[in-house]
């Protein structure tokens, strides 16, 4: 009997050691791995920063227990040689502005009185501003689609940029996971941008014929009702790089934006979805220009993402074919985390002033963890690195009948459930024990249920207003 108990304890400890080792273990993955797929953690690229790394003036690798995951500078060139780019605008990246302590990555900014840096302004005129010294790190493991990258971050209460991004080694393809200017400034000069998170990407033609495209639609500056500034808030933010032409953005576990080849779906500040596509461009060649309205890219509104895609013939990834590869993200990318004093902010005199820079805590970016997953076949999911999205059991009793106008079909379903009304935005599927087996956004009035096994479940669908409806569904093979 004692031997059995001892073996059980050993087995439990082995399980706990294998499966309870990361800070994010109890945080469900919000993105969909795809039909027949599950998520597998990429341990080399992921980090929960539960170790100590002290600032140094030297370029060094660092990570937990000798497992070197990062180097403390901007990413290297494709040939592995150092990249001497110091940073945008008045930014000067410094190795000694990076540390790991207290369970967080710390990247901060500072100034040296009298130090300035010159850069070229928007009208090709030279501009000089106080030099902002800041930290920058690069992951030693590159990523490529399909991949989900998510971080838990305390956004700086600063007009400086809190950044997590992906960049190809040749600097031509960029996906911005988070670009946030979270502080309004002591005179509220940055209040508009402080209330937004910029969900964007870039494609470039590099010098001598430099060109830079990024989405310029109003919805790329994402906001949420009740949030007047992101600075000082701790958020989860991630991107699911699904394919060369599809990006899905998540904030605090909720999908908020999709770029799908030639159309866009964005969750507005009130929680409702808006579906848009470009109203036009002057040309789809390299010399083309966006059609703008009130300073932003002019977009047409559609009734659904599929409707927008059917009506659009202009890429939202690379409308001017800068990449010359079929208008798609095709290259593996480096994961970069840094702080920046960006040129357009500095030119507009929205950089932190001396008094604001004196507050170290407002200008220190904290990253609790960053995790990276790739989808694998569910049948092959048998290692400790494989993670499903099943949540802890809920206290649940089926309740509330759907209104007569609402229909959920087919019955039984195999791969997709259709919902007859368009105002439902989120769905959860429970088994009869009350466990959440599936959690997804409702897209185009459809729910992908292909990952569910045969059986009877309870579907709970929620409107943007918070109103919910629950009913039984049947899944067949």
Swiss-Prot record:
Annotated Low complexity bias: 382-391
GO biological-process terms attached to the record: carbohydrate metabolic process
Known catalytic reactions: Hydrolysis of (1->4)-beta-D-galactosidic linkages in agarose, giving the tetramer as the predominant product
Sequence ranges assigned to domain GH16 in this UniProt record: 22-378
Catalytic residues (UniProt): 174 (nucleophile), 179 (proton donor)
Matching PROSITE patterns: GH16_2
Keywords assigned by UniProt, alphabetized: Glycosidase, Hydrolase, Secreted, Signal
Induction info: When cells are grown with the low sulfated agar.
Principal location class: secreted
Record-level Gene Ontology MF annotations: beta-agarase activity
EC number: 3.2.1.81
Gene3D superfamilies: 2.60.120.200
Any one Gene Ontology cellular component term annotated for this protein: extracellular region
List of residues binding substrate: 94-104, 123-125, 174, 179, 206, 340
Cleavable signal peptide: 1-20
Location in the cell: Secreted
Purpose: Cleaves the beta-1,4-linkages between beta-D-galactose and alpha-L-3,6-anhydro-galactose residues in agarose. Cleaves agarose in a random manner with retention of the anomeric-bond configuration, producing beta-anomers that give rise progressively to alpha-anomers when mutarotation takes place. Requires at least 4 consecutive agarose units and is highly intolerant to modifications.
NCBIfam families recorded: Por_Secre_tail (TIGR04183)
Protein name as catalogued: Beta-agarase D
UniProt source species: Zobellia galactanivorans (strain DSM 12802 / CCUG 47099 / CIP 106680 / NCIMB 13871 / Dsij)
Lineage of the organism: Bacteria, Pseudomonadati, Bacteroidota, Flavobacteriia, Flavobacteriales
